[in-house]
């Protein structure tokens, strides 16, 4: 499995995202630019320029018409994917740490930072596709996190709920129409922040990654913890693979905690776990520094990781990856 190395950022990666078709990959880093790449061969399509600070988050609409980014310059920007022009800028009082479109692309959520006397919020913006220039000025819904700020958030199936991961290690479920909190579960160890949340293809369950060195598979409906994957290093990102029953975890010691430069020492590898049996089944090395973000191709044929080293590595899976099975799984097939 030879990786394609994408070198377009000068600083560490924050988030990478495939579009729904999987032919494009978008990456954002601490260097103010958004890069778009062909996922098949790693060719760079272009960049989206305009942010004045580190870009924390990116998402692309389901129809690949719009791109949303959230940045440390306290704005959410909406871009035309094809032309690269910035269509709309929404200003917030603090930095924006996560953006995500609903499964139908009609709404966009933005998670804002708790800072300078402002509480952390989750804002929901309505998106207009009829006239791209005419976007709403104000959020249609604002959820304020009075207890622990939200660090990440996403939409459940049918955009019925907003699921948020918090700084204190808890996961919340909000009604996406009213903003009312319906559930709150202490999914991870107290005060170990949730660094990533990614959903299954049908959005009925999701995976969280946390600084407590574990990832959890959780139901969107009632926040029941279905599976736990234990790693030996703080995790920055986790993703669920379609086609095969695996999950991919990415992490590594924080850059400031690393005392030796050996890549093995810092545990800078993508880890593959069996989704059902919770066993670790393999690792993929390569990054020089922690993995900050992992993403899986929607067809399950490839995955990409973005690291503290400023590189995005795209791995297209080989045949053995798809052939690998537990004895139990083989028996099921024989039946």
Curated annotation (Swiss-Prot):
Molecular function, one GO term: translation initiation factor activity
Chief location category: cytoplasm
Ranges: WD repeats: 8-47, 50-91, 145-184, 189-228, 286-325
Compartments where found: Cytoplasm
GO biological process terms held by the UniProt record: formation of cytoplasmic translation initiation complex
Pfam families found in the cross-reference section: EIF3I
Keywords for the protein's UniProt record, in alphabetical order: Cytoplasm, Initiation factor, Protein biosynthesis, Repeat, WD repeat
Gene Ontology annotations for the cellular component aspect, listed alphabetically: eukaryotic 43S preinitiation complex; eukaryotic 48S preinitiation complex; eukaryotic translation initiation factor 3 complex, eIF3e; eukaryotic translation initiation factor 3 complex, eIF3m; nuclear periphery
Family: Belongs to the eIF-3 subunit I family.
Assembly: Component of the eukaryotic translation initiation factor 3 (eIF-3) complex.
Chain's role: Component of the eukaryotic translation initiation factor 3 (eIF-3) complex, which is involved in protein synthesis of a specialized repertoire of mRNAs and, together with other initiation factors, stimulates binding of mRNA and methionyl-tRNAi to the 40S ribosome. The eIF-3 complex specifically targets and initiates translation of a subset of mRNAs involved in cell proliferation.
The protein's name: Eukaryotic translation initiation factor 3 subunit I
Native organism: Aspergillus oryzae (strain ATCC 42149 / RIB 40)
């Amino acid at each position: 499995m030879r990786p394609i190395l994408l070198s377009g950022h000068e600083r560490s990666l924050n988030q990478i995202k495939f579009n729904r078709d999987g032919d494009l990959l978008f990456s954002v880093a601490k260097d103010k630019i958004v890069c778009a790449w062909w996922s098949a061969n790693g060719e760079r399509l272009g960049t989206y320029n305009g942010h004045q600070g580190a870009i924390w988050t990116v998402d692309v609409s389901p129809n690949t018409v719009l791109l949303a980014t959230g940045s440390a310059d306290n704005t959410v920007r909406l871009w035309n994917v094809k032309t690269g022009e910035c269509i709309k800028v929404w200003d917030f009082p603090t930095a924006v740490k996560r953006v995500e479109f609903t499964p139908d692309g009609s709404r966009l959520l933005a998670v804002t930072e708790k800072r300078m006397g402002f509480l952390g919020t989750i804002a929901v913006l309505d998106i207009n596709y009829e006239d791209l220039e005419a976007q709403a000025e104000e959020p249609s819904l604002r959820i304020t996190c009075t207890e622990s700020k939200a660090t990440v958030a996403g939409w459940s199936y049918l955009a019925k709920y907003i699921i948020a991961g918090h700084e204190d290690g808890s996961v919340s479920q909000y009604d996406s129409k009213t903003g009312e909190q319906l559930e709150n579960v202490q999914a991870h160890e107290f005060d170990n922040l949730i660094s990533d949340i990614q959903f299954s293809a049908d959005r009925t369950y999701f995976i969280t990654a946390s600084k407590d060195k574990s990832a959890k598979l959780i139901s969107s409906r009632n926040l029941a913890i279905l599976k736990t994957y234990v790693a030996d290093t703080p995790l920055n990102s986790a993703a669920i693979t379609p086609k095969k029953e695996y999950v991919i975890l990415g992490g590594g010691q924080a850059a400031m905690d690393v005392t030796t430069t050996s890549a093995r020492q810092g545990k800078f590898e993508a880890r593959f776990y069996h989704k059902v049996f919770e066993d670790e089944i393999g690792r993929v090395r390569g990054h020089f520094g922690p993995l900050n973000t992992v993403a899986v191709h929607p067809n399950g044929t490839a995955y990409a990781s973005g690291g503290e080293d400023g590189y995005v590595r795209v791995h297209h899976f080989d045949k053995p990856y798809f052939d690998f099975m537990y004895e139990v799984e083989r028996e099921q097939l024989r039946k």
